[in-house]
Amino acid sequence: MNMALLLASSVLAFQGVFSFEDDGSSLILRENDKAVWEFHYALVQPPFPVPAHYERACYFHPLYGLDGEIMTQDFPIDHFHHRGLFWAWPDSLAGEKKIDVWILKNARQRNLSRVEKEDDAERAVLSLVNHWAFDENPDQGIMKEEVEVIVYPAEDSHRAMDFTLTFTNVSDGTITLRGSGTDNKGYGGFCFRPDALRKNFIFTAATGRIEEDALALESPWVDISFPVVKGETALSGLAVFQHPDLPGFPHAGWILRHYGFLGQSWPHTQDHLMNPGDSFTLKYRVVLHRGSCEEADVPSLFQAYMTAQQSE
């Protein structure tokens, strides 16, 4: 084999080949036959003894680390509504009626019939449309979600995934979006529920280690790292980067809980009023990595991300 052919084959082996598998209720993404994540587009029924109203769809679980470890948790005993990697809001209003796709009391996200996917050696792209609907009328959309997820090949120490989430009011009335009003904590937005069986959790932001729980934080990124296997020293983790186009960037709406929760909460504790036809877009990069935040050099990965956005 000549040197050029050897180099080309090495690059392809490093980049990997992406493929999707559709099992009739979820999409499983693989790179070189190694699972990356599973996206649930059909409603997932709760396991016993979780109450039936917690059925949900439109979220990622399991999300896998670079060495095949499961990073996420679904239906955790302490918060039944937490679900892998997801986005949802609790104390929102459709007109004057509460619509809760967070606790899932009277409404939930449903995937519409259009699901597009493409895959090659350089990236995998998942494009889909969901909507929020009340349980009493599941076909009548209130809020439309247009989602694009771009997954890049695993590198030596990390994998990057870009999320673009566009929300449009498709109802006849106003929608008021906000985070949780309970104690004005502001829960709601782009959320990651780590596997709590693997704690303790180490949170790191641009300002350094975050030792206590936080309901707001001045940082454009946050990392959470935790043992690959409970009780052992080897770590893996996940970082969330805010895109510079995020409204209010850098947005302080971070929620960090050491029981096992990382949220980029937007609009956090402020109301966001949407008239019919109004829309907004949230963009994030998710980085899965081996080791701690420091070992993966997450600050440098964030700076490279910012540089790339500025050059576009």
Identify the meaning behind each predicted range.
Residues 174-246:
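Active-site/ligand-binding surface loops and adjacent short beta/alpha elements
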Residues 14-81, 178-180, 291-293, 299:
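Beta-strand-rich N-terminal accessory domains
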Residues 1-13:
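Sec-dependent N-terminal signal peptides
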Residues 130-136, 149-153, 167-171, 194-198, ...:
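Beta-strand elements of well-folded, non-transmembrane domains
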Residues 33, 128-130, 163, 169, ...:
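Short, hydrophobic/aromatic-enriched beta-strand segments in well-ordered soluble domains
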Residues 238-312:
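Beta-strand-rich recognition/accessory modules
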Residues 39-45, 51-53, 154-202:
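Acidic (Asp/Glu-rich), glycine- and aromatic
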Residues 80-157:
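Extended, loop-rich substrate-binding clefts of extracytoplasmic carbohydrate-active enzymes
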